[in-house]
Design a protein with these regions (language model features):
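Residues that line or immediately flank small-molecule/substrate-binding pockets and catalytic motifs
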Residues: 32, 177, 588
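Flexible, charged surface loops at secondary-structure boundaries
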Residues: 20-24, 72-73, 165-168
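Extended two-metal-dependent nuclease catalytic cores across DNA- and RNA-processing enzymes
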Residues: 92-306
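Non-catalytic, largely sequence-independent nucleic-acid-binding elements associated
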Residues: 72-82, 96, 102-104, 113-114, ...
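Alpha-helix initiation/capping motif
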Residues: 19, 31, 87-88, 132-133, ...
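N- or domain-start disorder-to-order transition segments that initiate the globular core
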Residues: 1-25
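Noncatalytic, basic helical substrate-engagement surface that gates or grips nucleic-acid strands
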Residues: 3-4, 25-152
Length: 728
């Protein structure tokens, strides 16, 4: 969003308001990030405690369906556009997240000082710190399930929307003010679903109100004011221009008019200013200007095009990032794969922002700087070796918010080509269905994928290297199953001969403990955390919110069980969260979230490898492939609500005179449902789900080899299991 734009437009009395009726028989292009951000940050739809829980908003799906239905009821067809491979603006997002950590600390200080109402208010101001990109895939899945069209742009959603505005593909555009910098005549700036009306503005009236003389001068004004991919010109930020105090967009226009120069000349004029040098502002302005002028979009025929390509500089890749294969953009455009790994490859950079808890813990910093490296290099190698040799020889710089000046290098060239390791997975539908029927397992379940390989004959026969005489995989069940087998082999659960490894056998033990498909993904995620030595009862975080009642043993066991519960979600009504909070468990969930996201990248790149290497029938529709992708594990982020519920229950039991008695257990469960978590759909049922997940994870721990879980740690788990069995 252009800094100061809304304030300026309101003061200048710009814009118009019309009823949704005017959108009848129209296709409305909607900038997805702006649409989601409005839900997250404005009343009555925002959930103030989302930054204190992590994960996904409880009411988001219902709100999206309601708002989409409202548009459709008025005869309007919504068409959502998501940003894709975005390299510009990452530094701005990083700095914004770093600044937000101070407000995060303030909110938690208020909560710790027993001022919950003030804390909730402060948390409510932090809704903008939620990384909307982490919610993209969830929202896309909602849209897909409800038959709402969407497209992921090659790069900027704003540029993509401008390129289709007023065409047969899109009659009108709604989104952030950034879109006005691109070639567009009119923009809907607000959709008011309560009043069923919208506000809109024209680019021409903005230009006239600012008194600038050309569209290029208007674009410079917007850039220098500050936007999503360029910070505000320091002289405007520090109010050193001599202009009357007011919206930055007005000040930027006045500065350009007073000097009768363009944006580049103005930046050259201030280039030696220490603030300009510190921000490398001239270089960043020039890149941002070219980013707008030579934007990249996808045409209806799937062709990727650059605007004004004839005058584009030869080093445009320094602005947009390395050019990626059009096949990758095609899969991205329909949600078959996400943008994370593509962004890494295009920009040669991974940027780690601070998590919602603030990121003060050494354990989290070690995880993102070192612990996630194997997952990242696995995803990068799957893409690089399947796409083009060029990408294999470009090191990726990992920059973390706590030490941005000392990036670490990830070298894909140091890895081996993973394709030869996993190319033997081309199992046919008849084999898959026959085995699923025999096991009485759903083909879509992880328990089937792992359990099928307990049969040594099936495992042996599953070695099916693709050859010229074999037809490629052509059914969703085939593609999904083989993508998952490849993923699990890459993660070490399956050996080269397709037999289960020691890790795979432990995982199978976990799945056999309870026949609950909804707990399979949490169990696998817990096992991955165990492998990283992050599923334990160690005090890893310098925060409040850990168990406080009972003996040291009670506290240790409560903490371990609560951390396991964080892998499964609390089923909550479609309303903002009400209940106790824990910064300690939020910090733990931040680590779980980081691992989950990187596991998802490996899963998606396993699917990409199948597609890019012609193991899948090329005639399969992109929508069909997308449906497969959205069914794969680790799609949605996790929150700490169920972990808090388990901690609250067990902590309260430890304060009872007879913590293991049925009377105490029932009384605390009723109290939890009625007083602590009044909007939980089934507090007691979710506690039992958490305990069932504990049973599964504990079964895997007990069966784990000593090099994964030491005898000392197994004893801690065993003691906790006995302790918990009396408190369920």
């Amino acid at each position: 969003m252009i800094s100061g734009f809304n304030e300026w437009a309101a003061s200048a009395q710009l814009g118009h308001t019309d009823s949704f009726v005017e959108l009848n028989d129209r296709r409305l292009g909607i900038e997805a990030e702006d649409f989601i951000a409005n839900i997250l940050t404005t009343a009555p739809t925002k959930e103030p405690l989302l930054p204190a829980l992590g994960g996904l908003p409880f009411a988001l799906e219902e709100i999206i369906i309601q708002q989409v239905t409202t548009l459709k009821d008025h005869g309007c067809e919504p068409y959502f556009i998501f940003s894709g491979v975005v390299s510009n603006g990452q530094e701005e997002r990083l700095q914004s997240a770093i600044r937000a950590t101070k407000s995060i600390a303030k909110a938690w200080d208020l909560y710790g000082a027993s001022q919950p109402e003030y804390a909730v208010t402060e948390f409510g101001t932090l809704s903008g710190t939620i990384n909307v990109e982490n919610i993209y895939r969830f929202v896309q899945d909602i849209l897909r399930k409800n038959g709402v069209a969407f497209l992921v742009a090659p790069h900027s959603a704003c540029a993509q929307l401008a390129s289709i505005a007023g065409t047969e593909f899109c009659d009108a555009v709604a989104g952030s003010s950034d879109i006005l910098m691109f070639e567009i005549d009119q923009l809907i700036t607000e959709l008011d679903f309560e009043k069923a009306q919208f506000s809109w503005i024209t680019r021409r009236e903005c230009i006239e109100a600012l008194g600038v003389t050309s569209t290029s001068m208007f674009v410079d004004t917007c850039l220098l004011a500050g936007c999503s991919f360029l910070p505000t010109l320091p002289q405007l930020e520090n109010d050193l221009t001599g202009s009357p105090k007011g919206p930055r967009i007005r000040a930027a226009a006045d500065l350009l008019k007073r000097g009768q120069i363009n944006g580049n000349a103005l930046c050259l004029q201030y280039r030696d200013d220490p603030a300009m040098v510190a921000l490398d502002y001239l270089n960043r302005y020039q890149k941002a200007s070219l980013y707008v002028k030579h934007y990249v979009c996808i045409r209806p025929n799937g062709k990727i095009e650059t605007a004004d390509v004839a005058s584009a500089p030869s080093d445009l890749n320094n602005i947009m990032g390395h050019r990626l294969p059009e096949e990758a953009f095609a899969y991205l455009s329909r949600g078959v794969i996400g943008s994370d790994v593509l962004c890494w490859i295009a920009s040669n950079e991974i940027i780690e922002r601070p998590p919602l808890d603030g990121g003060d813990a050494d354990a989290y910093r070690r995880l993102v700087s070192d612990g996630l490296t194997p997952l990242r290099t696995s995803a990068l190698s799957l893409l690089s070796y399947s796409a083009h040799r060029f990408y294999q020889h470009n090191p990726i710089a990992l920059r973390c918010w706590f030490n941005p000046a000392a990036p670490k290098k990830l070298n894909v060239s140091d890895t081996t080509d993973p394709r030869s390791t996993i190319s033997g997975w081309n199992v046919r539908l008849d084999q898959i269905e026959a085995k699923a029927n025999k096991l009485e397992r759903d083909v879509s379940s992880l328990a089937f994928i792992v359990g099928s390989l307990q049969d040594t004959d099936f495992a042996k026969n599953s070695v099916t290297a693709k050859s010229g005489g074999n037809k490629p995989l052509s059914s969703p069940k085939e593609v999904r199953s083989n993508a998952l087998w490849r993923f699990l082999q890459l993660r070490g659960y399956i050996q080269q001969d397709h037999q289960l490894s020691a890790l795979g056998k432990c995982l199978q033990t976990a799945f056999m403990r309870h026949n609950q498909q909804d707990l399979e993904e949490p169990a696998l995620l817990a096992f991955e955390m165990l492998r990283l030595n992050l599923l334990n009862s160690n005090n890893m975080f310098p925060y409040n919110g850990s168990p406080q009642r009972g003996s040291d043993t009670d506290k240790r066991n409560t903490l371990l069980v609560s951390r396991v519960a964080c892998f499964a979600g609390l089923r909550h009504k479609t309303i903002g969260f009400t209940g106790p909070l824990s910064r300690h468990l939020l910090a733990y969930t931040s680590m779980v979230s980081a691992v989950r996201g990187n596991l998802r990248n490996v899963v998606e790149m396993s699917l990409f490898g199948l597609l890019a290497n012609y193991h899948v029938d090329r005639s399969m529709a992109l929508d069909q492939l997308a449906e497969i992708s959205y069914s794969l594990p680790f799609l949605n982020d996790v929150d700490c609500a169920l972990g808090i519920a388990a901690k609250s229950y067990l902590d309260e039991l430890s304060a009872q005179g007879e913590p293991t008695s049925e009377t105490s257990r029932e009384a605390v469960k009723i109290k939890g449902a009625n007083e602590w978590f009044p909007h939980a759909k089934d507090f007691q049922g979710d506690l039992q789900r958490a305990f069932a997940l504990w049973d599964s994870v504990y079964a895997a721990v007990a069966a784990a080899p000593d090099n994964l879980v030491s005898n000392r740690d197994k004893k801690i788990w065993e003691e906790a299991d006995v302790w918990l069995s009396e408190r369920k």
